[in-house]
């Protein structure tokens, strides 16, 4: 559509940097793959080159979960606050924990992420937490939300 609008023969690269890019972190999905654009975005984040335009919508859908992530942090922090934990301490603990978990996931991103789930102690607290959420269909609801976001694109 853009090519028709500008009426010039140009190469258009679609890129959507996410807000954490201001920290020099986070993904930038680009379509179509382009060496110069990749080099540019590699300096400020993690460039993901998409080879098929139809597949790009999958990445854009995932970006629609940022507020859900923040809401999860908010719920966890508020739970601690209701347990008489100081608000600042609650938020620092939760955000520091999830930042560290994200770093571990990134370090393991070449392996199946399911491995991190399976590393939890069977019958332990994390095992209980993930299984309670599975029984409540939390993860299925997350996929359902992703499918709705995808349809909007």
Question: Which positions does each model-derived feature cover?
Answer:
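Rossmann-like NAD(P)(H) cofactor-binding subdomain of soluble oxidoreductases
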Residues: 1-30, 34-36
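Conserved Rossmann-fold dehydrogenase catalytic segment
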Residues: 20-22, 43-67, 86-88, 113
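A charged, well-structured terminal subsegment
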Residues: 35-54, 126-133, 138-140
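Residues within well-ordered alpha helices
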Residues: 40, 78-83, 104
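An accessory alpha-helical subdomain
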Residues: 65, 79-98, 117-122
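Oxidoreductase and adenylate-handling cofactor-binding alpha/beta cores
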Residues: 71-77
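NAD(P)-dependent Rossmann-like dehydrogenase/reductase catalytic/cofactor-binding core
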Residues: 95, 99-153
């Amino acid at each position: 559509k853009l090519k028709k609008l500008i009426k010039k023969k140009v190469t258009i690269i679609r890129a959507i940097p996410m807000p954490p890019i201001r920290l020099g972190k986070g993904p930038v999905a680009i379509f179509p793959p382009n060496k110069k654009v990749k080099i540019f975005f590699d300096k400020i984040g993690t460039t993901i080159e998409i080879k098929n335009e139809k597949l790009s919508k999958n990445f854009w859908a995932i970006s629609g979960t940022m507020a859900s992530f923040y809401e999860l942090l908010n719920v966890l922090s508020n739970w601690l606050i209701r347990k008489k934990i100081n608000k600042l301490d609650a938020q620092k603990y939760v955000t520091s924990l999830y930042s560290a978990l994200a770093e571990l996931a990134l370090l393991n991103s070449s392996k199946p992420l399911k491995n991190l789930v399976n590393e939890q102690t069977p019958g332990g607290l994390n095992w209980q937490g993930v299984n309670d959420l599975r029984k409540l269909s939390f993860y299925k609801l997350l996929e359902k939300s992703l499918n709705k976001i995808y349809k909007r694109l």
